[in-house]
């Protein structure tokens, strides 16, 4: 491993207690950047979430955690990963000092933002909880924006890793009573942060480990993670013992307690056993390093990651022995104390907010402006459905016979069965995995509009029902075989049942909206739904008749079809917003924002259909070509190749036969590539991003309110 940003620490100046024999201690040359990141995270927690008491976390007077555990972190990435690490430490402290159920909620809220999807279930909507949840989401959004600005690919890998960590680790099994080390160790590896650390280090070092090596990575690093987990248990024993006592538990989720039970020994005896095991596992990991250092069958980045873990082992030891987190009598250094008390020196905290993407295209893109027609979402992800109080039309009241006989009550079980039949197609599509973009848009927009959580939840439910209803109809009308990797609903329940349920669900959503909105707001929603159907009609007309729309017609269709659910959500939130919000000032800006967002989303979706391997798994290879759908790339190519007889005929043949062969699709794709239509599409998307950033900036200025969550959503839509 090449060393650019760190230096070896003289061994005579620190202690390791023999727990990292054979491994140097290295320290970053840029450790003040860690100080900035950690202190900034702590300040933001206090500001946006609430007081967190005495400072504790990543910093140390001589050895701060990231500086010695990831000493080769690229300098420009050191502050942001230190911020992330401090945020994780604070979250860990919260889940350690609350009850099990509350800790699960804390973890679920963390995972929700990492996955950009809404977590279903009951949520405490008291002001205190609302502020905490909104504060965490704000911090996480800002954090991801900073990471995306530096390295989008690594940032997205990191987010996935962190979501997995919060899902399966992060104190999820603190109620489990482990009494055998062999059963405890797999849990400890996850809880100590294997996936969190993977995301942090790969981002910090700029590593890209191939997916097919991830399982190998886990196998090769197992000994290191066991060693680090046991190290942490030695130093966190007093903290975790006290937390268990505080909550009246008769066990501690810590190797020291487990060893005490398994070997019938006291704390000192368990400590000795634990230290011996650490030495053994460190030695085993050094053997792995020796065996793999020249193995070219393993990617270079994986070998770098294996090497980096060596310094995580030694750095964890020297930091733990001197840090205030585990050593209450130790203080911070002079600079750290000064920054904590007086605030950080002036420095741009988030350059992404001032940066616009550069457009570099060989061909001038037609820039889709945002002042044409009204704007719906066609294919945003869906969350799980929640029941509403809207009547289904099935009465539980007594029924009179024509002869005026005694009242007969409808059998309740039969009514439940009928409702289950009616809603089964909806429940099927609502159960599919979702990216949660629609809910994320609503949450981000609400950072500006500040609608109470109860009302926001109802708006999300109604928009979710409308969205899933549109998907039921779209898949049937397009004859799509797959939806998110599963058979489309009409291929499970039949076309007639699917259409019937979709129609019912649209009416149900309108009923939900009527329950919490005034008549004028309901009328706006009805108008948007009518516009949505108009856009779908044009899309179907072009497909059926083989008519090639112009780019302007294509943009208008997107505004009518894909922008409308964004528009509906915006309208409902704006009408429910506090009277202090200057509606007249921001309404036109929000109108442009939703239209641009709809265009960005639809053009990106059509583009991904042609090029994305993940999309192929979810929907099939170039499914839009099977359906005869028009994308911007295809429209651009056709208008450049109006006399290409083979191309025109293969498209006509595909429509006639209800789909194309693999070879026919590849033929069309080759022409799209030759005509640089994919490059053109990318340039249009880049221009849309510029316009969206400008629109977000205008609204931020009008409301005097930065919105990192909205900017994060925009970054996640970048190709």
From Swiss-Prot:
It holds the Pfam family polyprenyl_synt. Isopentenyl diphosphate binds at residues 435, 438, 467, 484. Changing residue 474 to A: Abolishes prenyl transferase activity. The lineage of its organism: Eukaryota, Fungi, Dikarya, Ascomycota, Pezizomycotina. Mg(2+) 2 binds at residues 92, 96. Mg(2+) 3 binds at residues 474, 478. Residues 335-719 are annotated as: Geranylgeranyl diphosphate synthase. It catalyses: geranylgeranyl diphosphate = fusicocca-2,10(14)-diene + diphosphate; isopentenyl diphosphate + (2E,6E)-farnesyl diphosphate = (2E,6E,10E)-geranylgeranyl diphosphate + diphosphate. Mg(2+) 4 binds at residues 474, 478. InterPro entries: Isoprenoid_synthase_dom_sf, Polyprenyl_synt, Polyprenyl_synt_CS. This is Fusicoccadiene synthase.
